[in-house]
Regions:
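Central regulatory/effector-binding core of bacterial HTH transcription factors
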Residues: 1-35, 103
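Short loop/turn segments at beta->alpha junctions
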Residues: 10, 64, 104-105, 123
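Hydrophobic residues within well-ordered alpha-helices
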Residues: 18-19, 68, 111-117, 152
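A ligand-binding cleft/hinge motif common to bilobed small-molecule-binding domains
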Residues: 27-36, 88, 92, 106-136
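Flexible hinge/capping segments at coil-to-helix
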Residues: 36-73
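Short beta-strand->loop
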Residues: 38-48, 124, 133-147
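Secondary-structure junction motif
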Residues: 57-58, 72-93, 160-169, 174
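A late-sequence structural motif
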Residues: 137-174
Length: 174
C-alpha cells in the first residue's frame, strides 16, 4: 500500500525538499543547481507561448521569442528558475519582459492569460493540460533553447524504499 503526494512546485523548491528529506523524489529542469543529489534523465520539455483566444498572436502556428517580447506578459514570480531562464534569453537579444503580473504557478499564469491580461511562456505539457479547461492557445516557440531537459532527482537512490526505487525506474522508462 503506497500513497503518493504529488505537488507542482518550482524546480529550486523541489531540490530543497529532496535535500531536506521532505520529498523522496523530484522532477526538475536541468537548469537548477542540484548540489549533491543523484540525478537521472527523464525527458525533454518544450516551452510554448500561451495566449487568449482573442489575442493578436492567437492564430500563429509558431513564433520567435523576440517577437513575443513586444507584448505584455504574465510571468512567474521573481526567483522562479523558469522565469530566470526566460529572462536570460530575453537579455541575450537585448530585450526585457513587460510584465503585467507575476504569479506562482503555471495554472495561475494561464488563468490570467485566458483573461487576456497578457501572454505567457509555460511548458508545453502544462499548456496542453490547461487548454482542456481554459480558453488559451499554445503557440510553438521556434528558438532552439525552448527545449530543455527534465531530470529526476533523489538524495541517494540506494537509500530509497523499494517502492520509491520502483517508481523512479517506472518514470524513467515512460
Amino acid at each position: 500500500n503506497v500513497n503518493i503526494d504529488l505537488e507542482e512546485r518550482l524546480s529550486y523548491e523541489i531540490v530543497a525538499a529532496v535535500m531536506e528529506g521532505t520529498s523522496d523524489i523530484g522532477i526538475i529542469a536541468n537548469s537548477v543547481d542540484v548540489a549533491d543529489l543523484e540525478t537521472f534523465p527523464f525527458r525533454k520539455d518544450r516551452m510554448t507561448l500561451v495566449t487568449a483566444h482573442e489575442h493578436p498572436l492567437a492564430e500563429r502556428g509558431n513564433i520567435h521569442f523576440t517577437e513575443a517580447l513586444d507584448y505584455d506578459f504574465v510571468g512567474l514570480h521573481e526567483g522562479s528558475a523558469l522565469q530566470d531562464y526566460l529572462s536570460e534569453h530575453a537579455a541575450r537579444i537585448g530585450k526585457r519582459f513587460k510584465y503585467r503580473v507575476r504569479l506562482r504557478s503555471f495554472d495561475a499564469v494561464c488563468r490570467m492569460v485566458e483573461r487576456n491580461v497578457g501572454i505567457g511562456v509555460v511548458p508545453l505539457a502544462a499548456a496542453n493540460r490547461l487548454k482542456k479547461s481554459m480558453k488559451i492557445r499554445a503557440i510553438a516557440l521556434l528558438d532552439p533553447w525552448a527545449s530543455r531537459e527534465l531530470i529526476i532527482c533523489v538524495r541517494r537512490f540506494d537509500d530509497l524504499p523499494t517502492h520509491a526505487q520502483q517508481l523512479v525506474e517506472k518514470i524513467r522508462t515512460q
